């Protein structure tokens, strides 16, 4: 689309914030070398890291409402394996986060639906909700677990339905790969 007369500029704008280009990178590079202004603008934008520098600044300080989950929270608590079939539908799957009763956490329907209304009540206080645990994110379902946490604590991504970024997750210990997954999703672990 970079060569298209009417859509070239829009395509360039979209590509400036697209990072996973795989083999298509070479197509953009070749178009730029051949003199295509839109492709050159995309290459320059990537070189200038506009995809990163255009993101909102991290505030100097944050006021958060704490959602405290005692003990170890593994990824199966956040993204239960029996509900794996719903993982592609993040809002639906996030309903199962912390669905099993545990010390200090009262699910709406034990074994089926986590403390969704309780978390919503914390959000109603007007601040970010920070997920706070003792040990957080051990286990193998890191991305879907991060999606569940961010669904309840993050912010909508403009023009991307059913996906959120940002959020705050604190723990005495956060599993290293879960930590990296949260960072990749724009959260502050």
Annotate each language-model stretch with its function:
Residues 4-9, 36-37:
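Alpha-helix N-cap/helix-start positions at coil->helix boundaries
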Residues 2-5, 18:
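Alpha-solenoid helical-repeat scaffolds
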Residues 13-189:
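Fe-S-dependent hydro-lyases/dehydratases of central metabolism
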Residues 1, 9-11, 98:
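Extracellular cysteine-rich microdomains
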């Amino acid at each position: 689309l970079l060569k298209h007369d009417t859509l070239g500029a829009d395509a360039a704008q979209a590509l400036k914030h697209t990072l996973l280009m795989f083999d298509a990178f070479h197509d953009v590079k070749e178009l730029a070398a051949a003199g295509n202004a839109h492709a050159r603008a995309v290459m320059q934008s990537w070189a200038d890291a506009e995809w990163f520098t255009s993101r909102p600044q991290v505030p100097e300080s944050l006021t958060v409402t704490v959602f405290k989950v005692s003990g170890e929270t593994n990824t199966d608590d956040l993204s239960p394996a029996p509900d794996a079939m719903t993982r592609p539908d993040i809002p639906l799957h996030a309903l199962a986060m912390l669905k099993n009763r545990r010390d200090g956490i009262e699910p709406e329907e034990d074994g089926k639906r986590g403390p969704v209304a309780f978390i919503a009540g914390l959000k109603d206080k007007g601040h970010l909700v920070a997920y706070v645990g003792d040990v957080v994110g051990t286990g193998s379902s890191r991305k879907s677990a991060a999606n569940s946490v961010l669904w309840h604590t993050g912010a909508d991504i403009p023009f991307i339905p059913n996906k959120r970024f940002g959020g705050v997750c604190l723990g005495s210990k956060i599993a290293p790969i879960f930590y990296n997954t949260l960072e990749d999703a724009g959260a502050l672990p």
